[in-house]
Amino acid sequence: MTGVQTCALPISKYSPLSFRHFILGSVAIFVYVGVEVGVPNVLQKWLQNPELNVLGSGVNVEAIAGSVAATYWLLMLVGRLLGAMIGSKVSAKSMLMVVSSAGLLLTLGAMFAPNVPVNLPVFNGAEGFGLVNVPVSAALLVLVGLCTSVMWGGIFNLAVEGLGKYTEKASGIFMALVCGGGILPLLQNGIVDLTGGVGYLTSYWVIVAGLAYMLYYALIGSKNVNKDIPVRSEERRVGKE
């Protein structure tokens, strides 16, 4: 009687870390989560700092600062919905390039904008939408939420492109690197402390560096230069009597 036995090939000497664009993409994910968390985290602390009195007197500083930060997260949700609608029409590379550039411009604008007050529509969970008076820098940082909303998907798609059978392991590595959300804000807060508690906007150089790296990844770092590595899952079929 003749049968067919499936024999797995030897364990590959390669892994997701054998691909340069995946390694750079992993760094981009680490940086991205830090940017995503760091922008509203430091923004809220800046607005509610009693010594700086950014929002002025006679207002509920903590409530306003919280609603401004909440609006950032709301814009992230809006951005993801918009990203889902246009994602099939725009390449991951183009989308990441555009939102990284926009995020850079908004952040730099916030850092160097004059101290001019503007009315910002904000979301308050208890009262719905309303207008609050904040510095123009705060409004620009809130808009960064639209940019960060679609970065995860863009980075992931670029980083796993061409990985084939290594994609599953790559996903696990990505999930481990969300720790960037705790490290970059820590760096920002360290800068604030070093400046005597007044350098909140100065700390956004950390965010600028992160966004610049993601722009680099979209333009250059995402190119797969390891196409010689076999990525197909194969099995040998061995006949036996």
Which residue ranges define each predicted feature?
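Short, small-residue-biased leader/transition segments that mark boundaries at the very start
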Residues: 2-9, 239-241
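A late C-terminal transmembrane helix in Major Facilitator Superfamily
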Residues: 162-195
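Multi-pass alpha-helical transporter architecture, strongest
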Residues: 205-233, 237
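C-terminal ends and interior cores of transmembrane alpha-helices
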Residues: 102-130
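Intracellular juxtamembrane helix-capping segments at the cytosolic ends
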Residues: 149-164
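Helix-to-loop junctions at the C-terminal end of transmembrane segments
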Residues: 79-92, 192
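Extracytoplasmic gate region of multi-pass secondary transporters
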Residues: 18-69
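A membrane-interface helix-boundary motif in multi-pass transporters
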Residues: 187-210
